[in-house]
Structure formats: structure tokens, C-alpha cells
């Protein structure tokens, strides 16, 4: 049972960074709804599995960090702000075009709690960042494929599997910093060269979005 719970928790945590590659063409907003529904479902499975795992093994229980009470305070403030807003229902649930309401924020909080409780070593965080960077590289290469006509869309402004050039720019910007962080911590020239190549691909892709991610 414990092995199954560990597989669900770690598998789900490392599956989330791959979601930018997922597009659900059967939905009305294929670039938004598919990713968000998948994110919510995965987080709920991961969180439920983590609760059971933490009850049976103390090492998976959360350690104190100011990030969690700060994030929790934000949730409380946002709850009352949404409740007292002009459109509380939309504030809580958002819509299918954006899907960024309070429900999504709660799921992000749950994901953060599990990440902080389970990824407790530098090696695990390194694996996680490398997974995210690998996904970003695939997203970038797909976007460059759009420019060359290999894939549809994004000929003028690269949007890749995100469907929005502005979102693509922000996504690239974050991962440029992730790559820089990994390069600075690298101890071999081979790895530094590899990170530099990946970083250049991401920077070039960022420029091809036509925006700067701000």
C-alpha cells in the first residue's frame, strides 16, 4: 500500500510539469480547459494519497515554512475578496476560457503543500527542475516547428502548445531562470554547455513570441 501511495504522489508531482504539452482538442478551449482539468484531477489524487502517506510515515509530514502560512493567508484574503465581489460565483469558479478562479488557487496551494513536504532533498528538487526544463525545451522546439511550417499555427508569434504567445513568453522566461540556476550549480563543463544550449533555445523562442513575458 505504501509503495502505491508513493508512486501516486511522486508520479503526480512529476507529471504536472509535463502538462504544458497536453492539448485537449475535443474541448471548446483546447489549450486551457484540458490542462486545468488534468491539473485539478492530478492534484486531488496526489493530495489524497499524500494524506494517507503522511499518516503512516512521519517523514512525509510537512515541515514549518513561512511560505505555507503566507500562502494560507492569501487564500483567506482571496476567499473574502471573492465572496464580497460583484460576481462571487465567477470569482470562485472562473470560466472555461481562463479557469483561474479561487478553485484553481486552492489546487495550487495543495500542490505546493505536497511539493514542500515530499521533495525534501536537493536531488529530488534537481530531478523536478530538470523535468520541468525538459518539458519547456519540448514546448520550445514545437514552437520553432510552427515557425518552420512543421506544425500548424504560431507562424507570426510562437504560441506552441500553450495557444497564447503571452503565456508562452512567461513560461519561457521562468525556465530561462531555471536553466541559469541549474547551470550555476553545475560542476562540470559538459553540463554547463548543455544548459547554455538549452538556455539559448529558450531565449530565442521567447523572442519569437513577440512579447517579453511581462
What are these regions, as identified by a protein language model?
Residues 173-175, 180-182, 203:
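Internal metal/ion-chelating core segments
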